[in-house]
Regions:
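Catalytic core of membrane glycerolipid acyltransferases/transacylases, capturing the structured
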Residues: 16, 20, 24-28, 61-118
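Hydrophobic alpha-helical segments typical of transmembrane helices
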Residues: 41, 75-78, 100, 159, ...
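Short acidic-hydrophobic, aromatic-tinged amphipathic segments that line or gate anion-handling sites
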Residues: 55, 111-114, 205
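Residue-level detector of anion-binding/catalytic polar loops
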Residues: 52, 88, 111, 138, ...
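Non-catalytic C-terminal accessory region of glycerolipid acyltransferases
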Residues: 124-235
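A transmembrane-helix-recognition feature enriched in membrane-embedded lipid enzymes
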Residues: 1-54, 103-107
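Short, charged, surface-exposed secondary-structure boundary motifs
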Residues: 98-102, 122-124, 199
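Generic preference for hydrophobic
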Residues: 55, 66, 89-90, 197-199
C-alpha cells in the first residue's frame, strides 16, 4: 500500500473531523443559518481536501428529491458544497448515534430512518412530506442504501421509488465520479484527484414510465462506466 495515500487519508479524516466539530455548535446556536453553515463548511472541507470538481449539466431548482450514487462521505461533502439548498439527507438511524457525525445530523435536522422497524417507512414518508411541503427543503437519498465498495452500483432499495411515486415528485438524479479516490473509507487511502458531478435530466415521476427506477440505475451505471473508461484512456 502506498504510504503517502495512507497519510493523506488520515489528513483527510482530520480535516473532516475538524470542520464537522466547528459546524456542530454553529448549527446549534444559529439554526436559521443552517443552509449557509452546511454549504460553506463543506465548501471549505472540499478545498482543504484538495479536490477539484468539474460539473456537467445543471441542478434543477424544481427538484424535490435528489437520487445520488454512493461511494463515501465525499459524496455528501461535494453536493453540500455545490448546492446551497439546505438539503435534507435521509440516513439510517444508526448514523445518528455515531460520535460527532451523529450530532451533525441531529443539529442539521436531517431525516433518520429505522430499517428494522416496519413503522420506519411511515415515519420516513411523514418526514419527507413535511420537509418538502412545509420546510421547502429538497430531500437527498442514496437509493443504494449504503456505500458501494467499488465502481459497481448496488441494487436500488425500493424506498426512494415508493416516496417519489407516492408524492408525485420531481426527481433529479446525480452521478458523482471520483469520490473514492479522494477518500476511500474501505481501504483507508486517499489519492486525491478530480471529482466529476453530473446532473442528469430531472424525472417528472407522474409522467415517467413504469420502469423509470430500474432504468435510472442502468443509466447511472452506464455513465460511471463511461467516465472510468475515459479516465483510463487518458492515463
Amino acid at each position: 500500500m502506498n504510504l503517502f495515500a495512507r497519510i493523506r487519508f488520515y489528513y483527510s479524516a482530520f480535516i473532516i473531523s475538524l470542520i464537522v466539530s466547528i459546524m456542530i455548535p454553529l448549527l446549534y446556536f444559529f439554526p436559521k443559518k443552517k443552509s449557509k453553515i452546511l454549504h460553506y463548511g463543506n465548501k471549505a472541507m472540499l478545498a482543504l481536501l484538495f479536490a477539484k470538481v468539474t460539473t456537467v449539466g445543471k441542478p434543477d431548482d424544481r427538484a424535490q428529491l435528489y437520487l445520488i450514487n454512493h461511494q463515501g462521505i465525499v459524496d455528501i461533502i461535494t453536493l453540500e458544497a455545490l448546492l446551497n439548498k439546505n438539503l435534507n439527507w435521509v440516513a439510517k438511524k444508526e448514523l445518528f448515534e455515531v460520535p460527532w457525525f451523529g450530532l451533525l445530523l441531529k443539529n442539521g435536522e436531517m431525516i433518520s430512518v429505522d430499517r428494522e422497524d416496519r413503522r420506519g417507512l411511515i415515519k420516513l414518508l411523514k418526514d419527507v412530506k413535511y420537509s418538502v411541503e412545509e420546510l421547502h427543503r429538497p430531500v437527498a437519498i442514496f437509493p443504494e442504501g449504503t456505500r458501494a465498495k467499488n465502481q459497481k452500483m448496488l441494487p436500488f432499495k425500493p424506498g426512494a421509488k415508493f416516496i417519489a411515486e407516492k408524492y408525485c415528485m420531481i426527481v433529479q438524479p446525480v452521478v458523482i465520479v471520483g469520490s473514492k479516490s479522494v477518500v476511500n473509507e474501505h481501504e483507508k487511502t486517499s489519492e486525491g484527484g478530480n471529482l466529476k458531478v453530473i446532473y442528469l435530466p430531472s424525472i417528472d415521476v407522474p409522467n415517467a414510465s413504469k420502469d423509470w427506477y430500474d432504468q435510472l440505475r442502468t443509466d447511472m451505471q452506464k455513465i460511471i462506466d463511461q467516465e472510468l473508461e475515459q479516465y483510463e484512456n487518458k492515463r
